[in-house]
Amino acid sequence: MKHTASLTQGNILQVLLRFSIPFLLANLLHALYGAADLMMIIGAYCPAESIAAVSTGTQVTQIITSVISGLTLGATILVAKYAGRQQPDKIEKTIGTTITFFALFSIILSLILAFSTGMILQLLQVPQASMAQAYQYVFICITGIFFICEYNAFSALLRGYGDSISPLLFVAAACVCNIAGDLFTVVFFIWE
């Protein structure tokens, strides 16, 4: 099944809709990560302090993910440009640079967040009753920064080739894993 599309040929409205709808659905699914945590699992099995902690942690994670996603747009543009010009050597360099940059960026960002989580939560005025759990939740999310960076980097590269379906499938699989992981840790380990 071919997932790539030329965005410069054919009916522009149809082509853009075919490309953008999976992109929008992927963003919607990603936003539902936090909703799944809150409504389906934490809200059903944990006390109010846990709900406040996850709600705050989800906001922090969403901001971080949005920044990472925005930074990867440069790679999308470069891959699309070089693919259009049929310059495979420059595409390879862009891919290598993007993957390497975001791997290093994820390490640096994780370290910064690990040392500043308490300050961030204070700036967000997290209630004292939820502070410890919010810190714990954000810290757990920080361990996934590498995967968030690399997912967004790979998705950006694929979108540069005109493939917005594969990133949608990746984020759908990640949502299923997220919900399963949440159920496993919260329900079976009675994590509050």
PLM feature segments, named:
Residues 1-20, 79-144, 180, 184, ...:
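Short alpha-helical transmembrane segments in multi-pass integral membrane proteins
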Residues 9, 13-32, 60-67, 143, ...:
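Residue-level signal for short hydrophobic patches within transmembrane helices
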Residues 20, 27, 55-58, 102, ...:
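Residue-level recognition of transmembrane alpha-helices
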Residues 24, 28, 32, 36, ...:
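Generic alpha-helical transmembrane segments of integral inner-membrane proteins
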Residues 32-35, 45-48, 82-85, 160-161, ...:
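Helix-loop interface residues and adjacent transmembrane-helix termini in multi-pass membrane transporters
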Residues 41-62, 129-133:
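Interfacial/gating helices of multi-pass transporter permease domains
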Residues 51-111, 148-167:
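Small-residue-rich hydrophobic transmembrane alpha-helices
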Residues 159-192:
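Internal metal/ion-chelating core segments
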